[in-house]
């Protein structure tokens, strides 16, 4: 994920400045407008891109749902619902033009933390409360302050810690064998064979990704899944099981809670809301750079679609969503030009959500390769932090280690506290500034710097 902040967008998020090749160099280019939701001239490209990205989103969403300790069917329902909301929102207030919404790998351990502490029965209320907090942030346009209050390198450190959790969680699938093949000896012939298959699959996936990432990044996903399905027909390997859970529509109200539990849930939802918003702002910065027509993004408009989708998903026990960079990049390289592709993605995901029996053909080793690679990419995001200097890299590494060791919530808070203490000590001891002046300077800088962030 890119860790660069985005440029300030134009007032009209739908405008695109495009110079005519036949016009004089001194002539001011006329803005070219077009719907973010649908343009007839791009319909064919958007349909093809939606089919490709939708198929690629299935295994990725399955892995994220499993990492979040949510039913796979609920995760797919969240992706489908968020896609439909994103397309509808694009008619009125587009945040970006090719971003593909869905459940995010970076939030998976955060959701798993909520499930472990509050129970799955209270997560609908947590998602609803998170959506309400995001609605307040959207209404007051506070998202422009968040990347300043919470430095980008801390977010990259958090994502690296999350990536390590994902990598280790799904690495177990690489050597898992069927129950009937388990013996007293751990490294028996069946497990060694499974490790060899997983290694070959992962190496092939990485090779294809490096070869096609700038042209057709969905190719390695298709190759791995198709190869895994074929292999599963000729030999016995552990398969994904998707429980066909019913989706109930009900009010997202808390159950069996105490006062202290409610306080903890509020703090948890605040953390979840902030991380979700920051990830969306960072994704928009990257999506703007890969837009085929160089159109500007509006992060506050993207936040509108996020909180509406989160609020709606809480009524069927769904998860949080944002425009994921992996799916958005695939969408762009597959030929998407408008959010009409997102509508097609939603339809593809809906088909598999309603026909979960087709997902039982996915081998676990194929899912392991995809999710281990996803975790690695999140850890590799620390490379971006090197541009901020050694202090930022050190703090990002500390944040990542804390997130992995003590948890998302506690790790981020401790890292932010360390960051605040270091800056306070530098200003008070080195620059001899009074403590009150340091605090005032911080808020003055926060207000001033936010004017350059959309």
Predicted regions and their residues:
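Membrane-interfacial helix-loop connectors
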Residues: 67-69, 105-118, 287-291, 333-334, ...
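Intrinsically disordered, low-complexity non-transmembrane regions of multi-pass membrane transporters
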Residues: 1-44, 242-249, 427-454
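Alpha-helical transmembrane segments of multi-pass membrane transport proteins
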Residues: 25-36, 52-54, 108, 120-121, ...
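Short hydrophobic alpha-helical membrane-embedded segments
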Residues: 50-57, 76-80, 100-105, 193-200, ...
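Membrane-embedded helical hairpins/re-entrant loop segments and their flanking transmembrane helices
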Residues: 35-44, 48-51, 55-56, 60-89, ...
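Membrane-embedded alpha-helical modules
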Residues: 32, 43, 91-93, 113-239, ...
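Helix-loop-helix junctions that connect adjacent transmembrane segments
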Residues: 178-192, 231-274
């Amino acid at each position: 994920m890119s860790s660069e902040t985005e440029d300030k967008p134009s007032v009209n998020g739908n405008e695109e400045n495009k110079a005519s090749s036949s016009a004089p160099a001194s002539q001011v280019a006329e803005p070219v407008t077009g719907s973010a939701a649908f343009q007839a001239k791009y319909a064919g490209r958007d349909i093809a891109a939606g089919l490709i990205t939708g198929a690629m989103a299935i295994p990725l969403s399955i892995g994220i749902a499993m990492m979040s300790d949510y039913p796979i069917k609920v995760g797919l329902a969240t992706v489908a619902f968020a896609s439909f909301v994103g397309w509808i929102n694009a008619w009125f207030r587009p945040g970006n033009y090719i971003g593909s919404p869905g459940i995010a790998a970076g939030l998976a351990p955060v959701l798993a933390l909520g499930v472990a502490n509050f129970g799955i029965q209270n997560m609908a209320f947590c998602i609803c409360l998170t959506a309400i907090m995001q609605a307040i942030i959207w209404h007051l346009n506070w998202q422009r302050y968040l990347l300043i209050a919470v430095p980008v390198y801390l977010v990259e450190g958090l994502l690296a810690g999350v990536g390590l959790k994902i990598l280790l969680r799904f690495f177990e699938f690489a050597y898992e064998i069927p129950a009937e093949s388990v013996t007293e000896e751990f490294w028996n012939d069946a497990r060694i064979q499974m490790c060899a298959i997983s290694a070959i699959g992962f190496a092939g996936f990485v090779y294809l990704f490096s070869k096609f990432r700038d042209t057709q990044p969905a190719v390695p996903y298709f190759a791995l899944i198709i190869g895994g399905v074929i292999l599963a027909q000729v030999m016995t390997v552990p398969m994904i099981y998707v429980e066909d859970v019913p989706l109930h529509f009900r009010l997202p109200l808390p159950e069996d809670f105490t006062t202290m539990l409610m306080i903890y849930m509020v703090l948890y939802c605040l953390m979840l809301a902030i991380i979700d918003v920051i990830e969306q702002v960072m994704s928009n910065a990257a999506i703007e750079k890969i837009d085929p027509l160089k159109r500007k993004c509006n992060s506050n408009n993207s936040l509108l679609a996020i909180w509406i989708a989160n609020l709606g998903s809480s009524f069927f026990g769904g998860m949080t969503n944002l425009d994921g960079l992996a799916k958005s990049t695939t969408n762009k390289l597959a030929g998407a030009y408008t959010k009409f592709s997102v509508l097609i993605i939603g339809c593809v995901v809906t088909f598999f959500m309603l026909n979960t029996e087709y997902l039982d053909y996915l081998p676990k080793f194929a899912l392991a390769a995809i999710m281990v690679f996803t975790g690695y990419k999140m850890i590799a995001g620390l490379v971006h932090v090197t541009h901020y200097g050694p202090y930022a890299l050190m703090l990002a590494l500390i944040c990542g280690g804390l997130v992995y060791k003590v948890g998302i919530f506690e790790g981020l808070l401790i890292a932010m506290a360390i960051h605040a203490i270091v800056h306070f000590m530098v200003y008070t001891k080195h620059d001899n500034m009074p403590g009150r002046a340091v605090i005032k300077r911080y808020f003055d800088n926060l207000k001033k710097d936010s004017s350059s962030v959309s």
